[in-house]
Amino acid sequence: PHRGRVLYYRSGSAGSTITAAMLDLDLIPRSRVLHLTGITVALSASSRDAVESALSVASIAGVPVSFDLNYRAALWSELEARTAYRLIVPRCTVVFASVAEARILVGKPLAAVELAYEIANLGPTEVVIKDGGRGSLSLVGGKIESVPALEIPAVDTVGAGDAFDAGYLSGLLRGAEPRARLELATAVAAFACMSSGDWEGSPTHADLALLGGPHDVVR
């Protein structure tokens, strides 16, 4: 893929100054899923408190929580991240992580399947491990599903992880089976990689048919 460069000035950014008081927490009980990211947890103490408030409301209301570890070495150390993750992950329904991020969480250099089981032991119902060009796998109900990455003319991989999450959660909310969720997530991430920028390539459900295969099928 072509090399891209992203400049993100986190210090003093709007995201770093968010507080729990800024959140419309009344929206959470009416939501079908709450998606959180480790970047928000890492930005500042106030943004971490905001995440905690949202998570607490979702837990009380019985709203499923999705959490992507999204580790960024520029924001905090692996030890700091692991400590925070271990307070959040047990309260989540779905956890997304790359192999490297999963190893930070569990503290062991395990393979993807082993990492999924280790994370599931912490409490989440579903664990999804993203492994870039090698594909992805999920552990749901004690069963492992794996889907290979699609061969595409990659232009820019920035945003592929978020696109993957969006595709997976879309499948979950539409009632797709675990493997179909992974297939949908893989297709959405592929679209993200075929254009510059982190959101510009986001597909509609109609767009997904252009890649062929079972991505638009809810089983």
Where are the regions a protein language model picked out?
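Conserved N-terminal subdomain of the carbohydrate kinase-like
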Residues: 1-39, 209-219
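Electropositive phosphate-/nucleotide-binding environments in soluble metabolic enzymes
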Residues: 2, 45-49, 79, 162, ...
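Nucleotide phosphate-binding site architecture
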Residues: 15, 103, 199
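Short secondary-structure boundary/capping segments
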Residues: 25-26, 86, 119, 128
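Structured loop/turn residues at beta-strand edges in well-structured enzyme cores
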Residues: 26-29, 90, 122
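Conserved beta-alpha-beta core of the PfkB/ribokinase-like small-molecule kinase fold
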Residues: 33, 39-117, 125, 133-136
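Conserved phosphate-binding/catalytic region of the ribokinase-like
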Residues: 56-60, 108-219
